[in-house]
């Protein structure tokens, strides 16, 4: 969070679960966003392009001689997507006309989420399955399920994460809570990336993987949830390492990116709204999941639309936006008590 050091009080961002903020002129490295009319026309085309495939020769590719360029509608898989930002992302992709597979550890939440989404977007565009990302067999089954329903996965978003809903010093944290956080956020992420790459590298159209960051991913301390911050620091490192491995192995049709939703008013964030300082920054900087997803999804979709295979870090809460909100609060009292009572 290099851009926030000048204005955030000591440890403030860690206390509220704030992800890294950096000024950015364009969240998707200048990617152009396709208009809705253009997307509808692409989706309505016949032949191979209706399925999102347009043949394009590329060199190398780790044994893949040709890469089929992606066009909308896209096939999307999101882990941890029955509530919060994951569910909101699923809705936005469906609004754009894409096909989506959601998953969760809870069979009840999967059933409920799929039922609600099918009512709104139709039976043929969304599916769900129970999956514990900590279990390799579950993630392999998830891939098989997605392949059966959609044939390809164009966009895989690793959103599943946990802080065990525990905000306390490490010395007071139980073994069970530590295992919950580390196995979900680190082991689970690695398993998902492994299976996503193995599938996508053998697809004619390749694919894009997005790893969601969180507080601690920039290396700043996260007191009271040190384990969570340590796992999120590893997200950025893992993404860079996978990018390097793909390049070394001449896999030209798969790319791994980072995705930063900033502060989202989910159960995960709000469970930490226990101090005056935490409440202050949540009110100033946080946004509901649907607002964040409405911004992120077009920027995510712009990457395959522009046939880009460059690594991208998409951020919702930039440094400039944070500066502006903090100034408005100090000068005009804006957003006081917006989500939680401060007085």
Curated annotation (Swiss-Prot):
Superkingdom: Eukaryota
Catalytic activity annotation: 7(1)-hydroxychlorophyllide a + NAD(+) = chlorophyllide b + NADH + H(+); 7(1)-hydroxychlorophyllide a + NADP(+) = chlorophyllide b + NADPH + H(+)
Induction: Up-regulated by dark treatment.
Localization per record: Plastid, Chloroplast thylakoid membrane
SUPFAM superfamilies: NAD(P)-binding Rossmann-fold domains
Binding site for NAD(+): 78-102
Boundaries of the annotated transit peptide in chain numbering: 1-54
Keyword Cell membrane: no
Main location: plastid
Coiled coil start-end: none
Tissue: Expressed in leaves and stems. Also detected in non-photosynthetic tissues such as roots.
EC number: 1.1.1.294
GO biological process: chlorophyll catabolic process; PSII associated light-harvesting complex II catabolic process
Record keywords, A-Z: Chlorophyll catabolism, Chloroplast, Membrane, NAD, Oxidoreductase, Plastid, Thylakoid, Transit peptide
Remarks, miscellaneous: Chlorophyll b reductase activity detected in vitro with a recombinant protein produced in a heterologous system.
Function text: Required for chlorophyll b degradation.
Record-linked PANTHER family: CHLOROPHYLL(IDE) B REDUCTASE NOL, CHLOROPLASTIC (PTHR24314:SF15), NON-SPECIFIC LIPID TRANSFER PROTEIN-RELATED (PTHR24314)
Name of the protein described by the UniProt record: Chlorophyll(ide) b reductase NOL, chloroplastic
Organism name: Oryza sativa subsp. japonica
């Amino acid at each position: 969070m290099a851009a926030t050091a000048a204005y955030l009080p000591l440890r403030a961002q860690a206390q509220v679960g704030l992800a890294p903020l950096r000024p950015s002129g364009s969240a998707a490295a200048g990617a152009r966003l396709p208009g809705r009319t253009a997307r509808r026309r692409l989706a309505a085309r016949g032949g191979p392009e209706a399925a999102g495939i347009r043949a394009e020769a590329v060199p190398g590719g780790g044994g893949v001689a040709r890469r089929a360029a992606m066009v909308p509608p896209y096939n999307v898989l999101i882990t941890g997507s029955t509530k919060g930002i994951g569910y909101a992302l699923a809705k936005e992709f469906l609004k754009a006309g894409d096909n989506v597979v959601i998953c969760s550890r809870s069979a009840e939440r999967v059933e409920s989420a799929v039922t609600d989404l099918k009512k709104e977007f139709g039976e043929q565009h969304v599916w769900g399955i129970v999956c514990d990302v900590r279990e390799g067999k579950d993630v392999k089954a998830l891939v098989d399920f997605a392949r059966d329903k959609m044939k390809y996965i164009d966009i895989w978003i690793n959103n599943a994460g946990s802080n065990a809903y525990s905000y306390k010093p490490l010395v007071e944290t139980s073994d069970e809570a530590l295992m919950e956080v580390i196995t979900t956020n680190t082991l689970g992420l690695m398993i998902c990336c492994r299976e996503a790459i193995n599938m996508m590298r053998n697809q004619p159209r390749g694919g894009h993987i997005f790893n969601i960051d969180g507080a601690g991913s920039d290396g700043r301390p996260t007191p009271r949830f040190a384990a969570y911050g340590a796992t999120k620091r590893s997200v950025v490192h893992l993404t860079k390492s996978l990018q390097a491995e793909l390049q070394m192995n001449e896999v030209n049709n798969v790319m791994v990116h980072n995705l930063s939703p900033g502060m989202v008013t989910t159960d995960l964030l709000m469970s930490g709204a226990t101090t005056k300082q935490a409440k202050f920054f949540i009110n100033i900087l946080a946004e509901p999941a649907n607002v964040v997803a409405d911004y992120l999804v077009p920027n995510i979709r712009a990457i395959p639309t522009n046939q880009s295979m460059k690594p991208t870090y998409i951020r919702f809460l930039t440094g400039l936006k944070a500066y502006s909100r903090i100034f408005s609060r100090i000068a005009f009292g804006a957003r006081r008590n917006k989500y939680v009572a401060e007085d």
